[in-house]
Regions:
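Terminal leader/tail segments of proteins
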Residues: 1-83
Length: 83
């Protein structure tokens, strides 16, 4: 993974957030990946669905954002979302 930025500020459905690479990585420690439907993000040696990663990292429900939202935010941080 090539990190573009250490942290980013963004709005998601009208709410402001700040998220760092370290926030994402630490939030996924000890979390088992859900099944991969189409896209995945590799964190450590595990592949996770992008929505699971963003949900765990922000502490919000997956229904409150799209896979494209997760893709855009994670790629801005430098994570690679693969198919």
């Amino acid at each position: 993974m090539e990190h573009v930025k250490e942290s980013i500020n963004f709005k998601l459905r009208g709410k402001s957030y700040n998220l760092s690479v370290d926030d994402v990585v630490s939030s996924m420690k000890g979390i088992r990946p859900d099944g991969i439907l189409k896209y995945y993000v590799r964190i450590g040696d595990m592949d996770y669905p992008p929505k699971q990663v963003l949900s765990e990292s922000l502490g919000i429900q997956r229904i409150s954002f799209t896979t494209k939202d997760a893709y855009d935010i994670l790629t801005r941080l430098g994570f690679v979302v693969e198919e």
